Swiss-Prot record:
Residues 21-891 are extracellular. Residues 1158-1169 have a biased composition (Pro residues). CDD domains: FN3 (cd00063). Residues 558-652, 672-766, 771-869 form the Fibronectin type-III domain. This is Roundabout homolog 3. The gene is Robo3. It is found in: Membrane. It comes from Mus musculus. Disulfide bonds join 85-143, 187-236, 279-326, 368-424, 472-521. It is a single-pass type I membrane protein. Residues 646-655, 1038-1049, 1142-1152, 1346-1357 have a biased composition (Polar residues). SMART domains: FN3, IG, IGc2. One of its GO terms (cellular component) is plasma membrane. Receptor involved in axon guidance during development. Acts as a multifunctional regulator of pathfinding that simultaneously mediates NELL2 repulsion, inhibits SLIT repulsion, and facilitates Netrin-1/NTN1 attraction. In spinal cord development plays a role in guiding commissural axons probably by preventing premature sensitivity to Slit proteins thus inhibiting Slit signaling through ROBO1/ROBO2. Binding OF NELL2 to the receptor ROBO3 promotes oligomerization of ROBO3, resulting in the repulsion of commissural axons in the midline.
């Protein structure tokens, strides 16, 4: 109601706003609305309206035109929405909306509609309605504008509802990766429209993509390589217009593979010395460490693994040599680091070299023999030279210096320059030793010149603690005196740190950091002096000692004597030639000059001369100069060339003041450059700074040179700076991870000045920029579960540092098959084991430096073969099982399975309920039996007489007096169906006769019938060996005769005289037809017994014992039984005498199972009298051949119908003592006469009642023994039978139905009514032509029952009828009469004349 009021108010407001804006528009709107109505119904238009015939169109009228088209909308459920539509036309068109072709009802037309049509024509939805089953607002809408001139339609606009379900189709799962590995978290969002957008959150922070590392594609969160900081809780977020959904949190666990902080190193120790291998690792989770020896066991008793995981071995011996490996592993990965141990004996001299003095041109040899373990290597070195002489290596073309394989040094044709100390060194892995000897040359002197330094000290980089020799070999005459100074400080000979030898060599035994600096060798004599400068500096840890020379490694030989070619006042031009015997190539030349006018020393006047000719400028005029030339090579300066001849410059001008010819060179030599510590600015970039001391006015620029440290032969890379004031520069493009040596040299007008000591700086490492080379994958030893991955290091230019380790991945087609390993930097292969056979793997290798992991190699595919005894089927099935498991875990499958199980459970419950209900409905069928006779009309050919067909010879055909619903015996396919049946399947339920006798009385009657005679002329044929009779078989011990020729004849005629009013046969209808036995009724019915065979047993009636506990159970109906009537007189029944029995066997009464009324018992008879059913003779009764007497005067019913067509009285027939067997008919209903006294007790053996199991839930299909007895044929005479047929045939169906009204007659005690009230002349007796005395009718004619024929039933329904009425149980004293289920008892009794009299047997 509230919603309706809101809609109404909204409509009113909209309409009021429209009126306020434009009243004329409202009138036009009204006009348009009326026009649209008229367009829809032309009868509404006034006569002559132009919209009827189109002949009167206004000059300004126009057809509608859509000017604003409705757009496509996607809206959220529950939100308002508007589909705009505006149209033009005159008169103003009316707007209508259509959805999917159907007109849309708005609130203007239907107050219940939730859509509103706005004055502008727009369709307004206050709230979009959308559900799982009902989606009324979603669809395709069309706006139609109409006036009398026509209509215009808009475009089709779709309105879609945004939907976003709650459940994610796949929620992200926890992921565990190692640092550096890729990680993928998958998420499939819930279904929605529009398709939801997927984003990710870490905690509460939205993730953003990082180029090259974090990518979000299709709901997947992909990380190319993970960091430790990536660990955390991640959520998948799906959003669209309908809202936002967050998945459950998934954890990303980033573990760290073991990595070494300190690795074990290779160690060489002497025997009996201890050794310690360090190993320190980190990882997450904390790795476990253990040690192993690759080629043996750890030395027992001498090793110890300390708390810091280091391996300590004491007193090592040669047996301990080998490789020791530290193994660290955790759940993420495994890492190994190895160190080797070597135990050696240091080398020792066997023969040492001795000093020798020879003349120039002679040959000389120095012996040097050593020993050690392993054997040491021997090499020679001339003191002060960097050249090493190894065995079998010729250093000069003529081979003057040669070392033999035994270590002997041989010098041929000794020259003056060969003099000096020669050092023999023996080196092995255990250590090194050396010894030296002096070679002196006789007659080598120069007179009148300052000392000449033949070989001076070289610049050296030394390791702290090492020994160093600084040679200073000088010639001169007189013999010069050699002195040393360090950093401009003279060294004294008594200094314990420095040892000044006799030949001028300075020896420093164990150099310390304080010993580093500038050293100068000064040779002085009386004529002059000579100076040679050099420096020493500390070698850093990264430094490397120079290796053996691979080519000529000695300095170039001395050039030839320089020759003066041109002389001026200020310059001299010199020419020389290189030494042809030099083993090394001269790269440049240095020119030295001496002039007594300039001083008493040799000075360098030119440096870096590239050609063999040079012009020395800046000389003083008219001055004598001497020159010598030195060659410069990769291994240092050569010895000086022979001194040139003296040369004097020209005299230019006597007035010009004399100038110092060495002023420029001397000034640059005094400029000192001091380097500062370089600064790393970035990758591959270094800033170099320096300071300048001395005469800076002579400096015109600087030369900055650098090279990779450890390569003394490496070339320098130079950068010239032309600015004298710039004292810093930036070096770019430096190799990563390398140690760089840098030096600075000043530049002036006269050339280059002194060099600065070089400094060393490390360039930061970078991750390798190139992948490892030659990656290959080979199958392992087992060839189906392991592979070996091998590789080579990256190219040197791509390493960018020292390779510390390699990362190797072996990736399967799923993340759970991924494996990874790490290997040391020196390793070249690794083996993966435990792989799955048949799986395809990709192998990748990446090198790593301290800066990180570099570029991985291209994947190399390898597929492991299946084992020989295995096939790929299990693998495929395993994969299929895994895929099925994934499908089973999907929410959609679980929801569908739950729905299916629920539907099955619901169906099962419904079936169970229906079955229970049917059981309840059929519960009375389980313990009851009934039959409903129906009217049948015979065919003439079936009733023509005894000659055309046997009297009972229906054969396999059905009985015409039985309803079609009565089960018939089996027939052959050729048997014909009985014709003339009426109402075969739907008998009138009102035409049933109910017997209220309880089950207890029924059982009691059955027990009494076991040894009693029958109750009337109704016969019961029971197969004593039938299946259903086994229940009651114990109650008939006298029926155990095995004679197959005997028949059972019973039911004396005295019992047939009871009036119908005294026969209260009551019944109940069977639920369904049941199967008939294979035996037909004509085969089972015996001829009627004579009346003389019956006798009356006497004795008081005895109440059945144990009946109360059986009242709720009803046994199955016997296979074939006939209704039994009770006698109406108080006379006792007479048992048949054997002598009066016309039958071949004696007949004994057997209680009919079709009645529930107790009957007098029969006296015990011999068991041989009762044959089994299958032993009875199949005799055909003949027609009547002797006069018959009917036991009752009237044969028609009270309704005027012949006997057999109505519920008339039961007749009793007596067979005459004729040898020809007679036939008898039975009444259609079962009647009995109940006396006022108790039923006489049974005589003889009490029938033992066998209780039938109660386990049967219901009985739809009854066995042959469950059938109620069929009615016997009606009595007839030759003259009365046609009449009976005519009466039956002349009745209409309506009359027959009326004749079927139920009449339940109360049993009246004997003597309670006068005989005349009980019996009287039957109104139809004359019609049938029957005499008052009893007569016999021929037996064998079929009886035709009316449609309303009564039935008898045993019931266990929860009513009084289940326990029986007083009358059905028998009255006891004051017990009243039985109940009546039909019309009044008085009316029923008044219509029946009293016929109760006792018939004596004839």
């Amino acid at each position: 109601m509230l919603r309706y009021l809101l809609k109404t108010l909204l409509q009113m407001n909209l309409f009021a706003d429209s009126l306020a804006r434009d009243i004329s528009n409202s009138s036009e709107l009204l006009f348009g609305f009326n026009s649209s109505l008229a367009a829809l119904n032309p009868s509404l238009l006034p006569p002559g309206d132009p919209s009827l015939n189109g002949s009167r169109v206004g000059p300004e009228d126009a057809m509608p035109r859509i000017v604003e088209q409705p757009p496509d909308l996607v809206v959220s459920r529950g939100e308002p929405a508007t589909l705009p539509c505006r149209a033009e036309g005159r008169p103003r068109p009316n707007i209508e909306w259509y959805k999917n072709g159907a007109r849309v009802a708005t609130a203007r037309e239907d107050p219940r509609a939730h859509r509103l049509l706005l004055p502008s024509g727009a369709l307004f939805f206050p709230r979009i309605v959308h559900g799982r089953r009902s989606r009324p607002d979603e669809g395709v809408y069309t706006c139609v504008a109409r006036n009398y001139l026509g209509a215009a339609a808009s475009r089709n606009a779709s309105l879609e509802v945004a939907v976003l379900r709650d459940d994610f189709r796949q929620s992200p799962g926890n992921v565990v990766v190692a640092v550096g590995e890729p990680a993928v978290m998958e998420c499939v969002p819930p279904k929605g429209h529009p398709e939801p957008l997927v984003t990710w959150k870490k905690g509460k922070i939205k993730l953003k993509e990082e180029e090259g590392r974090i990518t979000i594609r299709g709901g997947k969160l992909m990380m190319s390589h993970t960091f430790k900081s990536d660990a955390g809780m991640y959520m998948c977020v799906a959003s669209n217009m309908a809202g936002e959904r967050e998945s459950g949190a998934a954890e990303l666990v980033v573990l760290e593979r073991p990595s070494f902080l300190r690795r074990p190193i290779n160690q060489v120790v002497l025997a009996d010395a201890p050794v310690n291998f360090l190993c320190e690792v980190q990882g997450d989770p904390q790795p476990n460490l253990h040690w192993r020896k690759d080629d043996g066991e750890l030395p027992a008793g001498r090793y110890e693994i300390r708390s810091d995981h280091s391996l300590w071995i004491d007193q090592v011996s040669s047996e301990d040599e080998g490789t020791y490996t530290c193994v660290a592993e955790n759940s993420v990965g495994r890492a190994e680091a190895s160190g080797s141990l070597s135990v050696h004996v240091p080398p020792q001299f066997v023969t040492k070299p001795q000093n020798q003095t020879v003349a120039p041109g002679a040959n000389v040899s120095f012996q040097c023999e050593t020993k050690g373990n392993p054997p040491p290597a021997i090499f020679w070195q001339k003191e002060g030279s960097q050249v090493l002489l190894f065995p079998s290596q010729s250093l000069q073309p003529m081979g003057r210096l040669l070392v033999s394989p035994r270590g002997q040094l041989n010098i041929t044709e000794v020259k003056i320059g060969d003099g000096g100390y020669y050092v023999c060194q023996a080196v092995s892995v255990a250590g090194s030793i050396l010894a030296k000897a002096l070679l002196e040359i006789k007659g080598a002197s120069i007179d009148g010149l300052p000392p000449i330094i033949l070989q001076g000290p070289a610049n050296q980089t030394l390791v702290l603690g090492s020994s160093v020799w600084l040679p200073c070999r000088v010639i001169g005459n007189p013999q010069p005196n050699i002195q040393w100074k360090k950093d401009e400080r003279w060294l004294q000979g008594d200094d314990s740190q420095f040892n000044l030898m006799d030949n001028g060599t300075l020896h420093i035994a164990s150099i310390q950091e304080m010993d580093m600096g500038f050293y100068s060798c000064v040779a002085k004599s009386s004529i002059g002096e000579a100076t040679w400068n050099s420096w020493l500096r500390k070698q850093e840890d990264w430094g490397a000692s120079p290796g053996p020379a691979t080519g000529p490694s000695n300095p170039p030989g001395p050039p030839s004597q320089p020759i003066v070619t041109e002389v001026t006042a200020n310059s001299i031009t010199l020419t020389w030639k290189p030494n042809p015997q030099s083993g090394a190539t001269a790269t440049s030349y240095v020119i030295e000059a001496f002039s007594q006018a300039a001083g008493n020393t040799w000075r360098t006047v030119a440096d870096g001369v590239q050609l063999e000719t040079y012009t020395i400028s800046g000389l003083q005029p008219n001055t004598i100069y001497l020159f010598l030339v030195r060659a410069v090579g990769a291994w240092g300066l050569s010895e000086p060339s022979p001194v040139s001849e003296p040369v004097q410059t020209q005299d230019s001008s006597l007035s010009r003041p004399a100038e110092d010819p060495w002023k420029g060179q001397r000034g640059l030599a005094e400029v000192a450059v001091r380097m500062q510590e370089p600064t790393v600015l970035g990758p591959r970039t270094l800033q170099v700074s320096w300071t300048v001391d001395g005469p800076v006015q002579l400096v015109q620029g600087f030369r900055v040179s650098w090279r990779i440290a450890g390569l003394d032969q490496g070339s320098w890379t130079m950068l010239d700076l032309q600015s004298p004031h710039k004292q810093s520069t930036v070096l770019r493009g430096l190799p990563p991870g390398a140690q760089i040596q840098i030096k600075v040299q000043v530049q002036g007008q006269e050339g280059l000045g002194a060099e600065s000591p070089f400094v060393t700086r490390s360039i930061p490492e970078e991750a390798p920029s190139g992948p490892p080379q030659g990656v290959a994958v080979a199958l392992g030893g087992d060839r189906n579960s392991s592979v070996t991955v091998s590789w080579e290091p990256p190219l040197p230019s791509q390493r960018n540092g020292v390779i510390t380790e390699y990362q190797i991945w072996c990736l399967g087609n799923e993340s759970r098959f991924h494996l990874n390993r790490s290997a040391a930097g020196w390793a070249r292969s690794v083996t993966f084991s435990g792989l799955l056979p048949g799986q395809i793997y990709r192998a990748l290798v990446a090198a790593a430096t301290s800066a990180g992991v570099g570029v991985a190699s291209a994947p190399v595919l390898v597929q492991l073969p299946f084992p020989p005894a295995a096939e790929p089927g299990p693998e495929v099935s395993e994969g299929l099982a895994e895929r099925l498991a994934k499908v089973l875990r999907k929410p959609a499958f679980l929801a569908g399975s739950s729905a299916a199980c629920g539907a099955l459970l619901l169906g099962f419950c419904a079936a169970l309920y229906r079955r229970q209900k049917q059981r309840k409905e059929l519960s009375h069928y389980t313990a009851s039996f009934a039959y409903t006779p129906a009217v049948s009309f015979p065919h003439s050919e079936g009733l023509s007489g005894s000659s055309s067909r046997p009297p009972m010879g229906l054969g396999p055909a059905a009985y015409p007096w039985l309803a079609d619903s009565w089960p018939h015996p089996p027939r052959s396919p050729s048997a014909q169906e009985p014709r003339g049946s009426c109402c075969p399947s739907n008998p009138d339920p009102d035409d049933r006769y109910y017997n209220e006798a309880g089950i207890s009385l029924y059982l009691a009657q059955t027990a009494r019938g076991a040894n009693a005679s029958g109750e009337g002329p109704v016969y019961s044929t029971i197969d004593p060996v039938g299946e259903e009779l086994q229940t009651f078989h114990g109650g008939f011990p006298q029926h155990s005769s095995g004679d197959p020729s005997t028949w059972s004849q019973y039911a004396p005629p005295e019992w047939s005289e009871g009036d119908s009013g005294a026969r209260g046969g009551q019944g109940k209808l069977l639920g369904k037809p049941v199967q008939m036995p294979s035996l037909s009724w004509p085969e089972a019915l015996p001829p009627p017994p004579p009346s003389c065979e019956l006798s009356c047993p006497e004795g008081p009636e005895e109440e059945l014992k144990g009946s109360s506990d059986l009242e709720e159970w009803c046994p199955p109906v016997p296979e074939k039984s006939h209704l039994v009537g009770s006698s109406s007189s108080g006379a006792c029944m007479v048992a048949p005498a054997p002598r009066d029995t016309p039958s071949p066997t004696s007949s004994y009464g057997q209680q009919s199972t079709a009645t529930l009324t107790p009957s007098p018992p029969d006296p015990p008879q011999p068991p041989t009298d009762i044959p089994h059913l299958h032993q009875m003779p199949r005799r055909v009764p003949l027609g009547p051949s002797s006069p018959l007497s009917v036991s009752q005067p009237a044969l028609s019913s009270h309704d005027g119908r012949p006997v057999g067509l109505g519920a008339g009285p039961v007749l009793s027939y007596h067979a005459s003592p004729s040898p020809v067997p007679s036939t008898a008919s039975s009444a259609p209903g079962r009647t009995r006469q109940v006396t006022g006294e108790m039923t006489p007790p049974l005589h003889g053996h009490r029938a033992r009642i066998r209780k039938k199991p109660k386990a049967l839930p219901y009985r739809r299909e009854h066995s042959p023994g469950d059938l109620p007895p069929p009615p016997l044929p009606p009595p007839e005479e030759e003259t009365s039978w046609p009449l009976g047929l005519r009466a039956a045939g002349s009745m209409s169906s309506l009359e027959r139905e009326r004749s079927g009204e139920r009449r339940v007659v109360q049993a009246v005690p004997l003597g309670a009514q006068p005989l005349g009230a009980q019996r009287g002349p039957h109104p139809d007796a004359a019609l049938l032509g029957c005499a008052a005395e009893e007569a016999w009718l021929p037996y064998g004619r079929p009886s035709f029952l009316s449609h309303g024929q009564g039935t008898s039933t045993c019931s266990t329904a929860g009513s009084n009828s289940s326990r029986g009425s007083n009358s059905s149980r028998g009255s006891r004293g004051s017990r009243g009469p039985g109940r009546s289920r039909s019309r009044s008892r008085s009316q029923s009794q008044s219509q029946r004349p009293g016929r109760n009299r006792r018939e004596e047997p004839r």
